[in-house]
């Protein structure tokens, strides 16, 4: 939907569990909407000065991409007005619910009930089912993808669960054992790299 520069309150908010993901998603939004005059996306996350975020919120943004903690901080300060919110996207909801459930509850209770909610999750634990039951419409559309439709059949997916102190040693052993092969290693946060 095209946006006019008169819109000052966010119409869409996407919550992510980490600042790195918030930055990545905000940059993607900005690229996709670069042709829309007056369209502004603001990533809000901890570790960044409030003053710059507040200045941009006052100027007006159509999309906020943030972490629950910083979103709640702005809500408490009254610098983030969400009464015009039309859509809420919970990205990696299983990660957020396991670590940030109270924050999600606070945010969701404060935003308009008429909003559209999209929830993306890799797993469907009971906490996600409870979140759906408590805060989403009774007309939920559940879309499930399995590895046959998502993953390439020629790719070998592997994972190893280890204690945090063992991660580097196990990773080095794994990389050395796969010499000459290519792969992608995903880490939860930038700090973990």
Model-based region annotation:
Residues 1-193:
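Conserved helicase RecA-like core
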């Amino acid at each position: 939907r095209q946006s006019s520069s008169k819109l000052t309150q966010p119409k869409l908010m996407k919550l992510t569990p980490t600042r790195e993901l918030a930055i990545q998603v905000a940059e993607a939004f900005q690229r996709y909407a670069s042709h829309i005059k007056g369209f502004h996306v603001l990533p809000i996350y901890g570790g960044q000065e409030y003053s710059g975020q507040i200045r941009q919120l006052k100027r007006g943004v159509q999309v906020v991409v943030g972490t629950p903690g910083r979103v709640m901080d702005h809500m408490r300060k009254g610098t983030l007005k969400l009464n015009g919110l039309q859509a809420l996207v919970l990205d990696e909801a299983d990660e957020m619910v396991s670590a940030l459930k109270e924050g999600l509850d606070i945010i969701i209770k404060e935003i308009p009930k008429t909003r559209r909610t999209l929830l993306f999750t890799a797993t469907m634990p009971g906490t996600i089912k409870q979140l759906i039951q408590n805060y989403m419409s009774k007309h939920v559309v559940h879309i499930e993808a399995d590895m046959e439709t998502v993953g390439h059949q020629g790719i070998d997916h592997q994972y190893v669960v280890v204690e945090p102190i063992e991660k580097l040693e196990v990773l080095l052993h794994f990389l050395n054992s796969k010499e000459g092969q290519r792969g992608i290693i995903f880490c939860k946060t930038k700090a973990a790299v």
